[in-house]
A protein has these predicted regions:
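Hydrophobic/aromatic beta-strand patches that form the interior of the parallel beta-sheet core
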Residues: 24, 131-133, 159
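Short alpha-helix in the alpha/beta-hydrolase fold that links the catalytic acid
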Residues: 128, 141-151
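Gly/Ala-rich beta-loop-alpha elbow adjacent to hydrolase catalytic centers
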Residues: 1-5, 9
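Alpha/beta-hydrolase-fold enzymes
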Residues: 9-98
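Catalytic histidine neighborhood in serine/cysteine hydrolases
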Residues: 147, 151-167
Length: 184
């Protein structure tokens, strides 16, 4: 599972451990990159926005999907220009791929979900091997939260991927070879 799917996957493993033999979590969202802003301040701001009926508004510097917008690759979550352009073309052609920024309600739900992952009662239920693929240059999720998860579970291993962004599977060829070798 990747990113937000890693959050959902972690919660499922905690709630229904009997359905899983092992898991690979790729740059899992076990915490959000809050850009150095303390979580209580973010929560207060998000709750205020929701209180003023702005839950459906885009949070902070996020925005809706803009078709055919050219984003500089250095601002993306990958460094492979070919893979970036391929995914960009897919997103432009298919309305179901046209997701983009987070709303205040999404941030609120994400903070709640990532907090639930770390409840001690839930963590104790995890009894399967878990492999976390951690991207050094992840600008969307918190690698520190992934480290915390690994420390608090008995059978979690982290594969640290240096110089790699959040979209690990869209990285350059040299990284992907090491990535797939490690996983398979």
């Amino acid at each position: 599972a990747h990113s937000m799917g890693g959050c959902v996957g972690s919660l499922l493993i905690e709630e229904y451990p009997e359905y899983f033999d092992a898991a690979i979590l790729n740059a899992p969202m076990m915490g959000i990159n809050l850009l150095g802003i303390p979580k209580p301040i973010v929560k207060a701001f998000v709750n205020a926005a929701i209180g003023f009926n702005k839950g459906a508004s885009f949070a902070f510097d996020h925005q809706e999907f803009i078709p055919n917008e050219k984003v500089e690759i250095k601002k993306s979550s990958t460094k492979s220009k070919a893979r970036y352009l391929y995914v960009s073309d897919l997103r432009n052609e298919n309305i179901y791929y046209q997701t983009n920024g987070a709303t205040f309600s999404w941030v609120n739900a994400a903070l709640e979900a990532t907090g639930n992952i770390f409840k001690p009662k839930q963590l104790k239920k995890i009894n399967i091997p878990i492999l976390i693929v951690q991207a050094e240059k992840d600008n969307l999720v918190s690698p520190k939260a992934q480290d915390k998860f690994a420390r608090r579970t008995e059978n979690t291993k982290i594969i640290f991927m240096p110089q790699v962004e959040h979209d690990t599977f869209n990285s350059k060829e040299d990284f992907l070879q090491a990535y797939y070798f490690e996983l398979f």
